[in-house]
Amino acid sequence: MTIAFQLAVFALIATSSVLVISVPLVFASPDGWSNNKNVVFSGTSLWIGLVFLVAILNSLIS
């Protein structure tokens, strides 16, 4: 169970890092938002899901 928690935390950190870099780039590009809207929403949905997964796994470990 601990390894699943560690992998979920790593995935959350990796997704956060990717979103921190990619979202400003999407907004800075001329047609970025209209072309990459689905990618931003998918990444945000993945991030929210990982937050809940880490919270659930944390409650099971503690």
Swiss-Prot record:
Transmembrane segments: 8-28, 41-61
Family affiliation: Belongs to the PsbZ family.
Annotated Gene Ontology cellular component terms: chloroplast thylakoid membrane; photosystem II reaction center
Keywords from the named record: Chloroplast, Membrane, Photosynthesis, Photosystem II, Plastid, Reaction center, Thylakoid, Transmembrane, Transmembrane helix
BP-aspect Gene Ontology terms: photosynthesis; photosystem II stabilization
Membrane topology: Multi-pass membrane protein
Main location per the UniProt record: plastid
Organism whose genome encodes this protein: Sorghum bicolor (Sorghum)
Protein name, entry field: Photosystem II reaction center protein Z
Subunit structure: PSII is composed of 1 copy each of membrane proteins PsbA, PsbB, PsbC, PsbD, PsbE, PsbF, PsbH, PsbI, PsbJ, PsbK, PsbL, PsbM, PsbT, PsbY, PsbZ, Psb30/Ycf12, at least 3 peripheral proteins of the oxygen-evolving complex and a large number of cofactors. It forms dimeric complexes.
Compartments, record wording: Plastid, Chloroplast thylakoid membrane
Pfam family, one: Ycf9
Function text: May control the interaction of photosystem II (PSII) cores with the light-harvesting antenna, regulates electron flow through the 2 photosystem reaction centers. PSII is a light-driven water plastoquinone oxidoreductase, using light energy to abstract electrons from H(2)O, generating a proton gradient subsequently used for ATP formation.
